[in-house]
Amino acid sequence: MSLINTKIKPFKNQAFKNGEFIEVTEKDTEGRWSVFFFYPADFTFVCPTELGDVADHYEELQKLGVDVYSVSTDTHFTHKAWHSSSETIAKIKYAMIGDPTGALTRNFDNMREDEGLADRATFVVDPQGIIQAIEVTAEGIGRDASDLLRKIKAAQYVAAHPGEVCPAKWKEGEATLAPSLDLVGKI
C-alpha cells in the first residue's frame, strides 16, 4: 500500500542535533514541511555521501521552511560518535534520529525486517503531516539533494496553487499545468 496522502503516525525518538541529545515527536513536524531521510546505517559508504549532500543544501531547505530528520536504526549515541569522527557527517546541522527499536522506520513501512535496517528512502511531509512524496532506492544507489529540493518546491507550489500541477522536470518559475478537458490529448 502506498503511503502517499496518508498522515504520519505518532512517534517519539531520541536524536542528536547540534551537539545535544533531543527528543523528536510528530508534534515537532506540525505546521512545517518536513523531510524524513532514512538510510541503512552509520559508518557505511553511500550513506555519508547522501547525508553530506543534504547538509550542503540544508540552508536552502531551511529557507523553504523545511525541517530535515535523518533516520537510521542506529542509536542517537552512535549518531553522535559518527558526527564526532567523520568530517562529512560533522557538517550536519539537522536532527539525526535514532530508531533502535525500528518503530519509526516501521511507521513509514520502510524496514528491512530480515536485517533490522531501514531502506534508503525519503519522505516529504506537508505541514498537516501528510506524506506528499516518497523516493526509495536500492542500497547501492545514492539520492540527490538537488532533486529533493526540486520535489519540495513542486509540492509547496501545488499546495499553494490548487488546480495546478507541476510537469516532469518542473523547476521554480517554469510553467505549470491546469488539468482540464481542453488539455486532454494535447500534451
From Swiss-Prot:
Molecular function GO terms recorded: NADH-dependent peroxiredoxin activity; thioredoxin peroxidase activity
Catalytic activity line of the entry: a hydroperoxide + NADH + H(+) = an alcohol + NAD(+) + H2O
CDD domains (alphabetical): PRX_Typ2cys
Pfam families the record matches: 1-cysPrx_C, AhpC-TSA
Catalytic residues (UniProt): 47 (cysteine sulfenic acid (-soh) intermediate)
Subcellular location: Cytoplasm
UniProt keyword annotation of Disulfide bond present: yes
The organism's place on the tree of life at top rank: Bacteria
Domain annotation Thioredoxin: ranges: 2-157
Enzymatic class: oxidoreductase
Stored InterPro entries: AhpC, AhpC/TSA, Peroxiredoxin, Peroxiredoxin_AhpC-typ, Peroxiredoxin_C, Thioredoxin-like_sf, Thioredoxin_domain
Enzyme Commission number: 1.11.1.26
Major localization class: cytoplasm
Gene Ontology CC terms: cytosol
Keywords: Antioxidant, Cytoplasm, Disulfide bond, Oxidoreductase, Peroxidase, Redox-active center
GO BP annotations listed: cell redox homeostasis; hydrogen peroxide catabolic process; response to oxidative stress
Disulfide bond as UniProt keyword: yes
Additional record remark: The active site is a conserved redox-active cysteine residue, the peroxidatic cysteine (C(P)), which makes the nucleophilic attack on the peroxide substrate. The peroxide oxidizes the C(P)-SH to cysteine sulfenic acid (C(P)-SOH), which then reacts with another cysteine residue, the resolving cysteine (C(R)), to form a disulfide bridge. The disulfide is subsequently reduced by an appropriate electron donor to complete the catalytic cycle. In this typical 2-Cys peroxiredoxin, C(R) is provided by the other dimeric subunit to form an intersubunit disulfide.
Quaternary structure (record): Homodimer; disulfide-linked, upon oxidation. 5 homodimers assemble to form a ring-like decamer.
Family (UniProt): Belongs to the peroxiredoxin family. AhpC/Prx1 subfamily.
Role noted for this protein: Thiol-specific peroxidase that catalyzes the reduction of hydrogen peroxide and organic hydroperoxides to water and alcohols, respectively. Plays a role in cell protection against oxidative stress by detoxifying peroxides.
Name of this chain's protein: Alkyl hydroperoxide reductase C
